[in-house]
Amino acid sequence: MAAPAKRARVSGGSPLVAPCPSPRAARAPLPLPAGSSGGEPEGDAVAGFLRWCRRVGLELSPKVTVSRQGTVAGYGMVARESVRAGELLFAVPRSALLSPHTCSISGLLERERGALQSLSGWVPLLLALLHELQAPASPWSPYFALWPELGRLEHPMFWPEEERLRLLKGTGVPEAVEKDLVNIRSEYYSIVLPFMEAHSDLFSPSVRSLELYQQLVALVMAYSFQEPLEEDDDEKEPNSPLMVPAADILNHIANHNANLEYSADYLRMVATQPILEGHEIFNTYGQMANWQLIHMYGFAEPYPNNTDDTADIQMVTVRDAALQGTKDETEKLLVCERWDFLCKQEMVGEEGAFVIGCEEVLTEEELATTLKVLCMPAEEFRDYKERAGWGEEETEDDSLAITDIPKLQESWKRLLRNSVLLTLQTYTTDLKTDQDLLSNKEAYATLSWREQQALQVRYGQKMILHRVLELTN
């Protein structure tokens, strides 16, 4: 799938509107396969899935096996023999993919395509899943047997609100989840439920449930793939998500050793580096911060493993820090005027965030321009505003790498520092509290899964923010 952007510079609306995550996520270790909770034992579920693979032409290399042994979480794929870089691990024929185009109600979904349009773009796939899940003779039943138990998904959207706020306040996750829940409910009652009721012969009462729909949204968010557009198709809408059996079994680490390749007839998983016998095969889904991982997949990478981790400074926080530094009402009005100017230039927004990574500022132009405009002398701002701030001579000065922070003007550094301090106040714990928990193995072991994952998210963000503080001294 196409890798998601690290963060839009001016964000608004639900994360569900964004493209699906790219190649699949690791899941939390708690969920068991759906088949294991009913009648089919776990070993039979794997054997049934492998028989299904042979039947549908899904070619697994004899060098790999599906297993729960030797994996970081749940089911995974392990090398039975050493694998060379470039070797084919498995190939999935397009006929085995589960999508609105391959499901048993594909004709109906195509005819009703206009009525099924939504912000997420996921409704046709979700309806396909709802229909196939209830069908005893669904061609994908052996594939479903390896799914995690839907009632035990660990996404924060399934946490009690109090727990979500207590553990993740300040990280950006609670706000993203609230938008998700609002959009899911709206999508279900305005589009999905009316469609199922209009075709009650195809959707039994057992699947007409907001709870089940929310669980499937989480599963699609974590397990689906999105085929990238061709280079010359950038103007087109993103491709719809689809389910890729076998590919979604792979777990994730940043230093992955496999990659999914798309062709006309097959989707192929290929080793990107040598894999030793007994080692797990990992996919990746792009550069994602820990807050994105826990939001979309229910897990976070332990510090400092996630080299793609980021911390956000809300854009309005920088405005608030600038307002706090004013001495009178006149200065406050000047700050507001400059903020309005930045909004009109689409440099900032009420729901946007400046994104700072481990080694770079990912929104360098936006942050540099904002600091400059909010800190420049009044006369200079008037000239800048008249030129609309976009003179060619300005562009070279608007880059901002982490290593450049100590070289900034003192007024810029002061505003950035105050913005970071305000951001740190939004968390429920301070850095030392989190640090003490992480360094105490016994105390860490007593934490629940959710507490451990939330701690990793908070700590990684705070370490980035504290580094910025040090650089502004």
Swiss-Prot record:
The reaction(s) this protein catalyses: L-lysyl-[protein] + S-adenosyl-L-methionine = N(6)-methyl-L-lysyl-[protein] + S-adenosyl-L-homocysteine + H(+); L-lysyl(8)-[histone H2AZ] + S-adenosyl-L-methionine = N(6)-methyl-L-lysyl(8)-[histone H2AZ] + S-adenosyl-L-homocysteine + H(+)
PROSITE patterns reported in the protein's UniProt record: SET
Which GO terms fall under biological process for this protein? negative regulation of NF-kappaB transcription factor activity; peptidyl-lysine monomethylation; regulation of inflammatory response; stem cell differentiation; stem cell population maintenance
What Enzyme Commission number(s) does the record list for this chain? 2.1.1.-
Please give the GO cellular component terms listed in this UniProt entry.
cytosol; nucleoplasm; nucleus
InterPro entries documented for this protein? N-lys_methylase_SETD6, Rubisco_LSMT_subst-bd, Rubisco_LSMT_subst-bd_sf, SET_dom, SET_dom_sf, SETD3_SETD6_MTase, SETD6_SET
Q: Spell out the post-translational modification annotation for this entry.
A: Automethylated.
Where does this polypeptide localize? Nucleus
The protein's superkingdom reads Eukaryota
Phosphoserine modifications at: 14, 22
Q: Kindly list the positions at which N6-methylated lysine occurs in this protein.
A: 63, 179, 372
What does the record give under GO molecular function? NF-kappaB binding; protein-lysine N-methyltransferase activity; S-adenosyl-L-methionine binding
Domain SET as annotated: residue spans:
62-286
**Looking at the record, which segments are called Disordered?**
1-23
One Pfam family here? Rubis-subs-bind
Summarize the protein's role. Protein-lysine N-methyltransferase. Monomethylates 'Lys-310' of the RELA subunit of NF-kappa-B complex, leading to down-regulation of NF-kappa-B transcription factor activity. Monomethylates 'Lys-8' of H2AZ (H2AZK8me1). Required for the maintenance of embryonic stem cell self-renewal. Methylates PAK4.
UniProt-recorded name of the protein: N-lysine methyltransferase SETD6
- Recorded source organism is Mus musculus
